């Protein structure tokens, strides 16, 4: 189960996450470069966070190395050259597109950033997946390969991060996992409901932002740990795994 937390904004939290036992760490954190978001980070801060996270897999006192926490760059309808510049400056291995980027835009981005992994955020409401099927088909025709579709709630005028949940039952029945990229579930996920969401939707991964923030809107380390633990425990149960 791939677990990501989005909206990290300072090196103090990056250091805290990097210091966690590997089992309690998220696989990835999101660096939000959308200026319209309260979670937006500037380039200098992002550079510092990436540097800290890059050391999270280094050998400790035990002499054993572990997997580093990955930094994912999140963009919303940003100019192509800006995304390419950020990707190269920060050596980002994964980019998350959260706006209304066209298939043609994505194809050009993939060509410019050869080898980068792409996540496509899609916003879904009660009306269903609608146009996203044709969107993904057009991307395929252009040679675009997404590594995941991050499914969030459709909220008019918003690009995500609203705390609302997409219709889980609809995703469970209508998401064409055999044809489309792996489903990464987002939207309204918290430590207390991520297990139920995984049980109902069976996603390949989960993502949260507000679900692990405190009342002041700051990322809460304890909530992150609980979210990661609950997500991985639920994923193990859904595969029929048992302890021991």
What are these regions (language model features)?
Residues 55-67, 237, 241:
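Intrinsically disordered, low-complexity segments used as extracellular stalks/linkers
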Residues 2-21:
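N-terminal basic/disordered segments at the start of proteins
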Residues 33-40, 50-57, 67-74, 78-185:
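Conserved anion-binding
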Residues 177-179, 183-200, 213:
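A C-terminal functional module that forms or caps the active site or interfaces directly
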Residues 14, 46, 83-84, 106, ...:
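Generic hydrophobic/aromatic pocket-lining and core-packing "Φ" positions
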Residues 17, 95, 149, 167, ...:
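Conserved, mostly hydrophobic/aromatic
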Residues 45-53, 108-109, 209-244:
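C-terminal helical cap(s) of enzyme catalytic domains, especially alpha/beta-barrels
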Residues 24-38, 96-102, 153-158, 201-225:
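Glycine-rich phosphate-binding active-site loops on the catalytic face of alpha/beta enzymes
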């Amino acid at each position: 189960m791939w677990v990501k937390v989005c909206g990290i904004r300072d090196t103090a939290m990056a250091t805290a996450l990097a210091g966690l036992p590997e089992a309690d760490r998220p696989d990835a954190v999101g660096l939000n470069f959308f200026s319209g978001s309260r979670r937006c980070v500037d380039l200098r801060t992002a550079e510092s966070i990436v540097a800290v996270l890059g050391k999270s897999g280094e050998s400790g006192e035990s002499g054993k190395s572990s997997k580093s926490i990955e930094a994912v760059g999140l963009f919303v309808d940003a100019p192509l050259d800006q995304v390419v510049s950020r990707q190269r400056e920060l050596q980002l291995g994964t980019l998350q597109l959260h706006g209304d980027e066209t298939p043609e835009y994505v194809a050009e981005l993939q060509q410019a950033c050869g080898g980068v992994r792409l996540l496509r955020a899609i916003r879904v409401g009660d009306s269903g997946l609608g146009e996203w099927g044709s969107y993904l088909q057009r991307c395929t025709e252009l040679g675009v390969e997404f590594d995941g579709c991050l499914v969030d709630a459709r909220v008019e005028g918003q690009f995500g991060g609203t705390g609302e949940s997409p219709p889980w039952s609809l995703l469970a029945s209508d998401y064409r996992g055999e044809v489309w990229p792996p489903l990464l579930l987002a939207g309204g996920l918290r430590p207390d409901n991520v297990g139920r969401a995984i049980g109902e939707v069976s996603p390949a991964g989960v993502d949260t932002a507000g679900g692990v923030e405190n009342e002041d809107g700051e990322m809460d380390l304890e909530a992150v740990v609980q979210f990661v633990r609950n997500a991985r425990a639920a994923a193990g149960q859904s595969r029929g795994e048992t302890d021991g």
